[in-house]
């Protein structure tokens, strides 16, 4: 499988990578990749929003039975079924819930790779208009020669401009960096 930038190499190692790879292969064989992605995304969103669920996932204090029972309740309430639900149950039964966020990230990497999508981290000083966002996507699509998924973040400390990370390449065209360069050049000129 092709690796897009440094993301796959670091994300697909260890336990998380093995679990994610097994899930991806099964989902692909059953033509359920998108359904599994949706279920995992829903669980991941719940995990980010709930301090109690985070405690359940991270704490070794809870027994396997308690974790499985709590996960069952969350899955039922969230309407997560099929392979995604079975995968989350398996992680709970094997005392691997603490690795689940990494497993979900690794699964997403595999899905993007299979679909020929690369991920780009984009930081801007202020939220972009839809037109600017489309322009950024089109430019990155041309550079990557692939479909691009944006991870957009607003960072007022940039003052202005943009910082883009695409795979192992990074372009910093922020006003903050330009001002720092000018400051260093002036200091060195003394």
Swiss-Prot record:
Belongs to the ATPase delta chain family. This is ATP synthase subunit delta. HAMAP family: ATP_synth_delta_bact. Keywords: ATP synthesis, Cell inner membrane, Cell membrane, CF(1), Hydrogen ion transport, Ion transport, Membrane, Transport. F(1)F(0) ATP synthase produces ATP from ADP in the presence of a proton or sodium gradient. F-type ATPases consist of two structural domains, F(1) containing the extramembraneous catalytic core and F(0) containing the membrane proton channel, linked together by a central stalk and a peripheral stalk. During catalysis, ATP synthesis in the catalytic domain of F(1) is coupled via a rotary mechanism of the central stalk subunits to proton translocation. This protein is part of the stalk that links CF(0) to CF(1). It either transmits conformational changes from CF(0) to CF(1) or is implicated in proton conduction. It comes from the Bacteria. Its main location: membrane. InterPro entries: ATP_synth_OSCP/delta_N_sf (IPR026015), ATPase_OSCP/d_CS (IPR020781), ATPase_OSCP/dsu (IPR000711). It is a peripheral membrane protein. Pfam families: OSCP (PF00213). GO terms for molecular function: proton-transporting ATP synthase activity, rotational mechanism. One of its GO terms (cellular component) is proton-transporting ATP synthase complex. It is found in: Cell inner membrane. The gene is atpH. NCBIfam families: ATP_synt_delta (TIGR01145), PRK05758.3-2 (NF004406). F-type ATPases have 2 components, F(1) - the catalytic core - and F(0) - the membrane proton channel. F(1) has five subunits: alpha(3), beta(3), gamma(1), delta(1), epsilon(1). F(0) has three main subunits: a(1), b(2) and c(10-14). The alpha and beta chains form an alternating ring which encloses part of the gamma chain. F(1) is attached to F(0) by a central stalk formed by the gamma and epsilon chains, while a peripheral stalk is formed by the delta and b chains.
């Amino acid at each position: 499988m092709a690796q897009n930038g440094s993301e796959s190499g670091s994300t697909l190692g260890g336990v998380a990578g093995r679990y994610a790879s097994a899930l991806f292969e099964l989902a692909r064989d059953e033509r359920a990749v998108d359904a599994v992605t949706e279920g995992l995304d829903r669980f991941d969103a719940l995990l980010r929003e709930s301090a109690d669920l985070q405690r359940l996932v991270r704490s070794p204090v809870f027994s396997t039975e308690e974790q499985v029972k709590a996960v069952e309740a969350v899955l039922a309430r969230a309407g997560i079924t099929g392979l995604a639900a079975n995968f989350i149950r398996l992680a709970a039964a094997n005392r691997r819930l603490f690795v689940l966020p990494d497993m979900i990230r690794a699964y997403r990497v595999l899905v993007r790779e299979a679909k020929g999508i690369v991920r780009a981290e984009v930081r801007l000083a202020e939220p972009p208009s839809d037109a600017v966002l489309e322009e950024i996507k089109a430019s990155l699509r041309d550079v990557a020669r692939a479909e691009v998924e944006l991870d957009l973040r607003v960072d007022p400390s940039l003052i202005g401009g943009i910082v883009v990370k695409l795979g192992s390449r990074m372009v910093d065209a922020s006003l903050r960096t330009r001002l720092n360069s000018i400051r260093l050049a002036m200091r060195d000129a003394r």
